[in-house]
Amino acid sequence: MIPILDNKDASAPSVFRPAALLREARRQKGLAAADIPAICILDPDGDIVRHIMRTGEAQPFKAWPCYHTRLDTFTLAGQTAGIVGCAVGAPFAVLVAEELFACGCRLLLSLTSAGQIAPAGLPPYFVLIERALRDEGTSYHYAPPSEYAEADPALAAAALAAIEREGLHAIAGASWTTDAPFRETLAAIEAAKSKGVLAVEMEAAALYAFAKAAGVRILCFAHVTNTMGQTGGDFEKGEADGTADALRILAAIVRSGVAGSANAPAQTPI
C-alpha cells in the first residue's frame, strides 16, 4: 500500500501527544501552565495579526509554550480571543490546533485566502467551508479515507445565520484542500469544478478531520481573493488587506453567541 494510506489507524492512540511536547517546552522556557482564550483564530496569511500589531490591539500571550509560533490576544466583539498567524498548510495548522486545544481553546476559527474554483461572484468574497476535498496528507492520520472532511453541520449553520443577521455575506460550500498550490493543474481544477467546489486552500480538510476525531469545535472560512494569478490585478483582498471584512465576519460569529458554548468543558484531544 502507498505510504499515505499505510499503517493508518485513526482509532489507535498516538505515542507522541501535544501535552508531552508542551510540558517539555514549558520546562525549557521556564513557563507556568496557563489557559489560553477559549476562542482562538488561525490566520494563515498573517494579515489579521499584522493589522492588530500595527494598531496596538495585539497583546502577546507570554505563557504560550509552542516552539514554532507566537500567540497574541486581542478583543473581538467584546471577548478576548487568541490568534496565531502564518501557520500555512495542513500539517502546520493541525499541529498548532492540537496545541491550542491542549492549552484551553474551545472554539477555533480558521480564515485563509483562497483561489476561486467554481465562480460564485467577483473576488474577494467569503466561503464558509461545509466540506473539504481531502487532497492533502494530514487528514488520513485522523480519519479513514473518504472524499471529503466535513464541518460540524450545526456549528456551520449557526455561524452562517449569525453572519447573515448582521447583513454580511458568506457562501456555504465546498473547498479543495491541497498540499501543493503550485501544482494546481488544469485537469485538477476542472475536476474540482465539476464537483461544485468553490475554492482551493490548504488547511480545512485536515482541521475538520482532526476536529471530528478529537471531539473539538473548528470552523473554516476561505476568503476567495484570486483566480490563481490568471488575470491581472489578482490577489486583491480589500480594505486593510482584507482584514476589515474578515474581522466583521469573525466578530459576527462571536457576538451571536455561537461561540458561547466555547466555554463548555473541554474535550480531551486524541
Predicted regions and their residues:
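Accessory terminal and edge-of-domain segments that mediate assembly/interaction
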Residues: 1-107, 115-270
